[in-house]
Amino acid sequence: MMMAMAGCVAAAAHAENTTLSDSSKVFDIDEVVVVSQPKEVMRLRQQALSSTSMSSSLMKKMGASDLRDLSLFVPNFVMPNYGSRLSSSVYVRGIGSRVNSPAIGLYLDGIPVMSKSAFNLHNYQLSRVDVLRGPQGTLYGQNTEGGLVKMYSHNPFDYQGSEVKLSYGSKYYRNVEAAHYHKFNNHLALSLAGFYEGEKGFFRNTFTGERSDQYDEAGGKLLLKARFNSGWKIDVLANYQYVDQNGFPYGKLNLETGKADLPASTFPGTYRRNNLISGFKLGYSGRGFDFSSVSSYQYLKDRMLMDQDYLSAPYMRILQEQLQNSFTQELSFKSNRAVGGFWNWTVGGFFSRQWLKTNGPVFFDEAMTTPIGNGIQQQMYSAIHALMVKTMMDKGMPEAAANAAAAAAIEKAGGISMAVSMGAPGVYHTPQTNLGFYHESNFNLTSRLVATLGIRYDLMHTSIHYQSAAFMAMTANMMGQKATFTLKSALDGKAKDDYSQLLPKIGITYQLDDQQSNLYATVSKGYRAGGYNIQMFSDILQTELNAHRQQAMRGDYDVPHTPEDYEKVNQTISYKPEVSWNYEVGAHLNLFDHALHFDLGAFYMKVKNQQLSVMAGNYGFGRMMVNAGKSHSCGIEAALRGQLANGNLDWMLNYGYTRAEFDEYTDGEGDKAVSYKDKKVPYVPEHTLSAMADYRLQLGSSLLRSMVLGANVNMQGKIYWDNANSYGQDIYAVLGAHVAFDLGKVQLNLWGKNLTDTNYNTFAVDNAATGKREYFAQRGNPFQCGVDVSFRF
């Protein structure tokens, strides 16, 4: 890799000696869109890390309205579009998570978004998005092991006026956005923005007849900024969003063809969410240092209902209602000029407290309870029938006659029947407290060489109070005698854990030339917090009910639990923190007098106790997090971005390769143990590729100033859907295009997505609710087209 990097350096040197007639230049986004950075002292492409930045205009060209869309154009960074807004899985360099602790951090206008359930937001009126890949734990703490995403709204001090955007597309897609930016004076500015978006959806449930992916969402945000001559500044912000949608359009997957059917679940999946992110930021720029205080309060209330078996027969449903309140406080200081001409520093502390209450019952329906009742009924009938036959035969009746007579007697007396009802209610309180202290120094060893040293101490306290139960009510009608017996298993327990980590970082950057091209190398530690699985309680309790079913045949029975039982449960539901070491080398090259930016990086990660999301236990009633022993991932990332034709042609090309494999991971015990050593880590694409080109035709007309022709493509694959690598998604590509017209204060944009109507799956899962393993997947969205009309005044 170092030889390849040296070759790139040589090419860069040659390129810089080449003078082109084209005067087009590509600027770092830090030079164009300046935002508050309370911790960093250098621009992104001057730091020892891999990153991708997107401006407002670039996001509009790509048609990106949320992080799922943005991820399509970032190498080795994937947020698949599936499920609902609750689904916020992100996979970066072989690190990822479907549930519980996230693999990346998300900052919205400088506020850390604390709930993973809130990551999948509608993005609008943004000036800039930065995606940092690789562990960012030194400055940003736990759960930034895969990277960090920072989103920034327009600054009303720099951006004034009003905007209205109206959009309409196929499948009854509609969108309305309105925003106003006002600068009262040099000391006070305000922005207000709101949106509504909805869509009929692509996938019709063949059982219910409803669209399984229709949605409506709306929200608003406020940003008030104050600046004072004394060096102080204040920001007050609030961002509220509401979503109401059908979701989880999973259809049966044909493993041979790789194609998924339309969804056919008995119960329509739904998701509703209220989410508020608010913050108060206080800053001061003094002599030699900057001070920043960031306080936030966040509220999330949601409700998910999902058909857990995804079949047209009613087996089971799961309800999940979350109520979360979070508070964060961060204080940071950094130098605003080099001490002694060579030392820049950052120091700070972070505190957060989260309160989360989850109501998560599992409902068992007729397709599951009827076979259980029939099985018990058959056992009862056989036992009574055999006893009657024996009695008759003892009196001298022939066996055949005794069998017939016993059956007739049972039928005449009212027969034997058994009705079973089951449920698994549960309420879980899982508060968390996090405390971190950090320091980072950047030393200018020479005019071109910079060394970075950082360290963070991170402490997490997590606890759980679970009140969970499972019951089986059996109503027996035995030859005219009716009785109901209830078998119940209830757990009411508590557990707690403390985790602490030191998160160091060492980096070095060497500037190659006066164009700010540089080479870098870095070593950093990543960390993802441990915690508790709550969705697996129904599986634990159902296993207990099956083990004690016979006791309920004689009357009501409550399964007893000893302190040893609770200790075993606490060990079963907990999972350990995930820890990784990341080794990375790379280059940020500015070529042809800044007409071309070329970023190249290579990484190797060693992961211990990798957290994986799997279906719980024997029945697959819910997802749970488990720890694999060890894994590793390695790969490369390359990004090219340039301008040609006097700035009229914008283009970019991104490629990422990740090879993520298990080194130690054995699931199960004894004869049932399965080793996944050398298997690929699931849900991680091996290749990611994206490209975009926009050509502007300057028309010079007073009515039509210019026209833009643009096209983009993104590619992913191969992706495995399980630890055994038994099935997956082959590599696929999705093509998009748009034509934009500049009419002065009016902008018109015609767009199309998935122009070739590529058939692919964004997610797949299996379960054994029916007693045999079934496979399901969600299709990627098919062809769609539409139009945007924007007004600015």
Model-predicted regions and their roles:
Residues 67-70, 90-94, 107, 143-165, ...:
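N-terminal periplasmic accessory domains that precede
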Residues 281-286, 290-306, 518-522, 535, ...:
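Membrane-embedded beta-barrel scaffold of Gram-negative outer-membrane proteins
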Residues 334-335, 346-352, 447-451, 593-607, ...:
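Gram-negative outer-membrane beta-barrel transporters
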Residues 204-210, 248-264, 309-316, 363-425, ...:
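Solvent-exposed loop segments that connect transmembrane elements
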Residues 161-163, 168-199, 203, 207-245, ...:
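Transmembrane beta-barrel wall of Gram-negative outer-membrane proteins
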Residues 26-60, 87-89, 157:
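N-terminal periplasmic "start-of-domain" segments of outer-membrane beta-barrel proteins
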Residues 356, 369, 527, 647, ...:
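C-terminal beta-signal and adjacent terminal beta-strands/loops
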Residues 109-135:
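Short acidic/polar hinge/loop motifs at secondary-structure boundaries
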